Amino acid sequence: MICFMRKASVVITLCFFTSFSQAAELNHSREYARCMGLAPSDPNDAYEMATAWKSMGGGDAAEHCAAVALYYSGKAEYAARRLEVLAETIIATPEFKGEILGQAGRAWLSHGDALRAEATLTEAAKFLRGRPGILVDRSEARAALGDYKGAVEDLTNAISVDASKAEAFAFRASAYRYLDELGKARADIEAALILEPDAAEALLERGILFRLAENKDAARADWLKVLELDPDGEAGRLARANIEKMDVNVN
């Protein structure tokens, strides 16, 4: 549910190559774009590229790409640690430090350390002054810690700034469900699906709400749709598990 590189890529590119003399030349800018573009699809090659580039003066930009490559290679803990160090040592604007910390927090979430993620994202939020994306990410960390009221607070604040994102409504619906506020959960999930009718996370959550209301046919329909939309993702995995659990309970 977390997009590691969302929102920040343009800001990061501009900041690296307007703020740091060691990476100010055009060839470094091209290396950064190449390295970051390679990281999601071939993280091992991107990491090797970043390491070699850093030895030739790539500086903080090369270090950033190395950390991102570690994340995409499944080494989220190492990525998070390097991103935290980078955010601490880099000479940059507060907003840019916040972007790097936000990526570190998302990496901690992927690693499964919700406590560290919540702390890191809280620090990022101080720099980013309540930017909605950071609040949505921190809400997920808080929910993982069982702090559903805190998650609702973050999501409500995020929605008050930008009410156009289906995921914020879907996540808040889930938090409301855990707080046993099912009416609010249903209202949020319908809002999410108005914004994005094929949002897998929202359909997954609506299916859960249907199951709680004993409407098993509707629940199954939503979960089967999730499997069509996201067969190999986390939403698909959870939809499959819910169908299997429901079938076992029926039998």
Model-identified regions with their sequence ranges:
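N-terminal leader/linker segments that initiate helical-solenoid repeat arrays
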Residues: S21-R81, N251
